[in-house]
């Protein structure tokens, strides 16, 4: 189990993660695409990255909008693992 980040640690980490913000015990980013098909192409890339990392975001899809949330459930909050995964997801769609 990883140690959850303190609020100052989390704020520092979020400063380098475009689009991500704290939401409760998670970090979240919202994406907007031109249509449903583009949103699903992105979600499929997210799924591939998540499987490779062994760390899976919560995903909400509403037509062309995708919301991703990352938290380490076993730690009860955001850990370095979530920050690393958010960085990887930003590589897929900056």
Swiss-Prot record:
Signal peptide: none annotated. Pfam families: Pterin_4a. Its EC number is 4.2.1.96. One of its GO terms (molecular function) is 4-alpha-hydroxytetrahydrobiopterin dehydratase activity. The keyword Lyase applies. GO terms for biological process: tetrahydrobiopterin biosynthetic process. It catalyses: (4aS,6R)-4a-hydroxy-L-erythro-5,6,7,8-tetrahydrobiopterin = (6R)-L-erythro-6,7-dihydrobiopterin + H2O. NCBIfam families: PRK00823.1-2. This is Putative pterin-4-alpha-carbinolamine dehydratase. It comes from Koribacter versatilis (strain Ellin345).
């Amino acid at each position: 189990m990883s140690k959850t980040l303190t609020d100052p640690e989390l704020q520092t980490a979020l400063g380098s993660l475009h689009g991500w913000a704290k939401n409760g015990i998670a970090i979240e980013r919202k994406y907007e695409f031109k249509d449903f098909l583009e949103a699903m192409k992105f979600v499929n890339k997210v799924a591939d990255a998540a499987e490779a990392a062994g760390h899976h975001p919560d995903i909400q899809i509403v037509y062309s909008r995708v919301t991703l949330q990352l938290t380490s459930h076993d730690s009860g909050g955001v850990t370095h693992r979530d920050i690393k995964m958010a960085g990887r997801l930003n590589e897929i769609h900056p």
